[in-house]
């Protein structure tokens, strides 16, 4: 009887882990300054356009999104406060992203600043999403 209970318990754990309908996304934010400003980090599903957001405190580097549905995503961030100046010399919030330039090394030779699509898989953790390109990531003028 004891062995049957153990078998049923282990089977339920296995079924629960196999039926996961979401994944986790872990990464870091960088900022070209001596500190990291408070910001909002976003994941956008490429198929549904649904956006997930997370608040990052000042000088916080790591972030973690839980229960993100499987799919293809892009990651980007906007500062909470206006800390940059636009082309018209007007204060603006800054934005950055996880772009093709990030895995390239963010050097002068890295010309592709388009957002990099990554996959979230059910029951898995997608790691190393680095929102570090604050010089060429092209996004909307305002945060979602």
Q: What is each model feature region?
A:
Residues 59-67:
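Short, surface-exposed beta-strand/beta-hairpin micro-motifs centered on an aromatic residue
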Residues 1-4:
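Positively charged n-region of N-terminal signal peptides that target proteins for export
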Residues 71-87:
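A short, solvent-exposed beta-strand micro-motif common in secreted/extracellular proteins
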Residues 53-58:
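Short beta-strand segments within Ig-like beta-sandwich modules, predominantly Fibronectin type-III
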Residues 23-31, 131, 141-142:
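A short, amphipathic beta-strand motif
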Residues 15-17:
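C-terminal motif of bacterial Sec signal peptides marking the signal peptidase cleavage site
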Residues 32-49:
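Short, ordered, surface-exposed loop/turn motifs in non-cytosolic proteins
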Residues 83-129:
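Structured interaction patches on ligand/partner-binding surfaces of diverse proteins
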């Amino acid at each position: 009887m004891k062995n049957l209970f153990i078998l049923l318990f282990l089977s339920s754990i296995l079924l629960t882990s196999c039926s996961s309908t979401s994944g986790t996304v872990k990464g870091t934010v960088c900022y070209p300054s001596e500190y990291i400003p408070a910001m909002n980090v976003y994941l956008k599903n490429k198929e549904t356009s649904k956006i997930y957001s997370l608040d990052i405190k000042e000088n916080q580097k790591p972030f973690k999104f839980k229960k993100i549905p499987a799919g293809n995503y892009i990651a980007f961030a906007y500062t909470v406060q206006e800390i940059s100046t636009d082309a018209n010399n007007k204060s603006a919030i800054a934005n950055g992203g996880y772009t093709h330039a990030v895995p390239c090394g963010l050097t002068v030779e890295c010309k592709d600043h388009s957002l990099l699509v990554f996959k979230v898989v059910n029951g898995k953790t997608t790691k190393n999403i680095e929102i570090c390109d604050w010089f060429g990531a092209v996004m909307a003028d305002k945060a979602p």
